[in-house]
Amino acid sequence: MTIRKAKLNDVPDIHRLVNHYAGERIMLPRTLTDLYENVWEFTVVAEDEGRLVGCGALKLYNQEVAEIRSLCVDETLKSKGIGREVMEELLNEAEAFGLKTVFALTIAPTFFEKLGFREVPRERFPTKVWRDCLRCERYTCCDEKAVTMELADRPTKLGESAPEATEVSS
């Protein structure tokens, strides 16, 4: 399995994968135009034979905050750790940018909580709500939960608790 940044020729496969879940009302649809304009946000997982099997995007909001978006894995390969690997890479990117906080709106908060995220009120991210949520057809009946992670508290390995601080005496 190879984890890498998305390329323009990945867009049709990202579109297929994301919109498969959008059709099941698990995530929001993305147009081809939107994906081409924002392909740089995506990290992609590809199997050795080059088949795209998972993706996720890091949407920057300001110098401190980014959103994890469009995180999904081919339905036939769920529960194999691919989503966790994509998330790990997205968090590495967030840290490389010097961000402090990442968040997601999701109908699967348990997945994120297992990785060290915690549920918070959606109103904590007003830019997201005003930019995207108000235009969503599901705004008035949204069932997504907001989850967040402070990168300073990020576990060394996703799914494990952050190490306890220890005192060092001289």
Can you annotate each of these PLM segments?
Residues 1-2, 96-102:
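Short active-site oxyanion
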Residues 100, 106-133:
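Conserved active-site alpha-helix within GNAT-family acetyltransferase domains
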Residues 29-41, 47-48, 54-65, 70-71:
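A conserved beta-strand-loop-helix scaffold within acyl/acetyltransferase catalytic domains
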Residues 2-14:
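A short beta-loop-alpha structural element at the N-terminal edge
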Residues 125-170:
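C-terminal "cap" of GNAT-fold acetyltransferases
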Residues 16-29:
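Helix-loop element at the rim of GNAT/NAT acetyltransferase active sites that forms part
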Residues 79-94, 104:
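Conserved acetyl-CoA-binding loop-helix of GNAT-fold acetyltransferases
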Residues 71-78, 107-108:
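A short, internal acetyl-CoA/4′-phosphopantetheine-binding micro-motif in the GNAT/acyltransferase core
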